[in-house]
Design a protein with these regions (language model features):
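MFS transmembrane alpha-helix packing/gate-lining sites
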Residues: 59-67, 117, 148
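Cytoplasmic helix-loop-helix junction between adjacent transmembrane helices
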Residues: 110-149
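Conserved MFS/SLC helix-loop-helix module at the cytosolic interface between two early adjacent transmembrane helices
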Residues: 66-102
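Pair of pore-lining "gating" transmembrane helices in MFS-fold secondary transporters
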Residues: 6-37
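Extracellular/periplasmic helix-loop-helix junction of adjacent transmembrane segments
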Residues: 34-65
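Small-residue-rich segments within alpha-helical transmembrane domains of MFS-like 12-TM solute carriers
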Residues: 21, 25, 99, 115-123
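Paired small-residue
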Residues: 94, 105-113
């Protein structure tokens, strides 16, 4: 792989990381309003709305925690690129389901799917970046990965 091709892959991975984290971060401020609206539509007890907000906020990273090791093992077996693509497709599905949710149950399903699939994107992308960069440039590329994730 030549230098230009390698740089294009690095930029694409960094952009993917940025978009996934942007999608996660954009939803968080609207999640309480969205949850309240769906809870009231489902005629749920208003005292439980805050419980659902907390659970919907935490269920996403909880499923990321559960599945990150699974994705890591699968990426070692099947390769990095297919699992990054699968994770990004799952991320798109999660965002569509979240936007189209008409009940709290659908929102829970969307958040669980999001946690499962996005847990592949960050660690597998970092492993892929590590695979395609030289030891000399690896620290710099990993720093850029951190920037993409935290931006």
């Amino acid at each position: 792989m030549n230098r230009k091709e390698k740089l294009n892959r690095i930029y694409l991975i960094l952009l993917s990381l940025f978009v996934v984290m942007l999608g996660y971060g954009i939803l968080l401020p609207t999640l309480p309003y969205y949850t309240e609206r769906l809870a009231l539509k489902d005629n749920l007890d208003t005292n439980l709305i805050n419980f659902h907000i907390g659970l919907l906020t935490s269920i996403y990273p909880f499923f990321q925690l559960l599945f990150v090791v699974v994705w890591g093992k699968l990426s070692d077996k099947y390769g990095r690129k297919p699992l990054i693509v699968i994770g990004l497709i799952g991320f798109v599905v999660m965002n569509l389901l979240t936007g189209l949710a008409t009940s709290l149950t659908m929102l829970y399903i969307a958040r669980i799917i999001g946690g499962i699939f996005t847990s592949s994107v960050i660690p597998v992308s970092n492993a892929y970046l590590s695979d395609i960069t030289s030891e000399k440039r690896r620290t710099k590329i990993m720093a850029w990965s951190g920037v993409a994730i935290s931006s």
